[in-house]
Every structure is written in C-alpha cells, then in structure tokens.
Amino acid sequence: VTPDKWLRVWNERHRDTPLTLLQAPAAEARDLLVGGGADAGLVRLPVDRAVLSAIPLYTEQTVVVVPRDHLLTAVDEVSPEDLADDIVLHPLDDVLDWERGLPGRPALERPATTANAVELVAAGIGVLVVPLSLARLHHRKDLTYRPLKDAPESRVALSWPEAATTDQVEDFIGIVRGRTVNSTRGRTQAGTGGKPAERKTGAGGKSGAGRT
C-alpha cells in the first residue's frame, strides 16, 4: 500500500481537484466516511456492508511489541506460548479479534488506547500485540517488535460510502488498483445506469482516509 504514490498519481490526473490525506483511529473510520468527512479510506475489516463498499487490499502481519532488552528479542518469531509469563496489554481500541482469548497474563485494567499501551510497554509493565502498521506508527527507540504466529490477523480494505460512489471515487479506486489513465474499468460506463460489480468484492490502528 503506497498512499504517497496514490496522491502523486491523483494530482497528475486531477490537477483541479486536490486530494487530502487524513489519519483517523480505526474506531472512528466508519463515522468519518458515513458522515462525509472523507470520500474513501483505508479501514480494517469487517465493515458495515449495508452502508459501505469495500475492496480488500491485504492482510497485515501481527507482532508483539516489547522493550529492547526483553528476552523475546532473542528469537525471530514468537508463539502465544512464549507469552505465558508476560502481562499482555489489551487496549480498548484493539483492532484484533481474539476469539480464542488473549495470550499471556491479563493486566488489571485495559489501557484506553494503543498509544497508552505503548507507554506501559516502555515502562516495563507488559507487552502489546498489534498489527505491524501500529507497531511502526508508535515506534520508540526503546521498543522493538517480533512477529507473533498463530495470532489473529487484520485485513485492510479500501472503503467508501455505497451511496456516494462518484466518478471521482471510481477514479481513485482505479488508481489504487494500478489502472492506467486510459483504462475504462472502475468507472460506470456511460448509459449503463449501473455500478461496477467489482466495488462489492469486500466486506475496520490508524486508518487512512482521502478527501477530494
């Protein structure tokens, strides 16, 4: 996923319609899109398919964030069993689906946000399991991370309001999919009165949102 490239290509093709990139917490992404605060955005699946269309883009790796002097830094990959003796922090804005339960020992209280949890990891209070992009977003020199196997994964999609599928949104979808300027796919053909079926191929850290 290369938002900077999408922005560059958009500005080359739509010089009179600037594209602005925003950042929003995953929990706020749906309301931002539905409320018209953004035309399209990168969100974590699942989304409410009654109001949002989505195109799955990729599945993100899950990692465990630990202090740089933690014992787990001695291995290249961590298993849930390796966390048995650690307090695993579970922030209220966690984007992972722990159907089988969180590994390790639970904290007495759940941090309000992922950012708060990262501060607690730095203080040596516990470790944190997050998608890779969130580990990078909250990077600190005193922390590092390792891939966590057999953990829930987060799927990321490009999403937009079903009722607001404009030609500009269709053009942006085409850019995300790597289509050339001469491609007619991704935009409703003149006179068909329909919407392209490919918009319905998908089903919500930070989420990126675009506003034209």
Regions found by a protein language model. Give the residues of each.
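Short, high-confidence coil segments that cap the C-terminus of an alpha-helix
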Residues: 16, 37-38, 125-126
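Secondary-structure junction motif
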Residues: 3, 76-110, 166
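A ligand-binding cleft/hinge motif common to bilobed small-molecule-binding domains
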Residues: 34, 44-52, 114-143
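Short beta-strand-centered segments that line the small-molecule binding cleft or hinge
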Residues: 6-9, 13, 27-62, 143-146
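Intrinsically disordered, compositionally biased tail regions
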Residues: 201-212
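Short beta-strand-to-loop elements that line the ligand-binding cleft
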Residues: 18-25, 91, 104-116
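Flexible hinge/capping segments at coil-to-helix
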Residues: 54-62, 66-88
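A late-sequence structural motif
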Residues: 5, 146-199
